[in-house]
Amino acid sequence: MAKKKVFVSGCYDLLHSGHIEFFRQAAEYGDLYVGIGSDATYLEYKHRKPMFPEEERLFMVKAVRYVKEAYINAGSGTLDFLPTLDIVHPDILVVNSDGGSEAK
């Protein structure tokens, strides 16, 4: 039986232990796929440039042992990950409550 595909999304700028723990917990449900907010979405959402450019954030997230694959999200705004969902076709979408807003 194939493992379920699990999807999470975020900016992951200044990747830290809280992100790693989130990945670990999400990966308990199956193979973990991660969407990363683009530089443009980061600027739109946080009103400043990220500390690390999208390609560097992608590299760091892919290096995390719990992550099967990672992508730079091609959409914009809070739901910037929708085009990535069309690529991954996850069985499970995991959303955390950390750093959230009413829109989240």
What role is predicted for each listed range?
Residues 1-104:
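Nucleotidyltransferase catalytic core that binds NTPs
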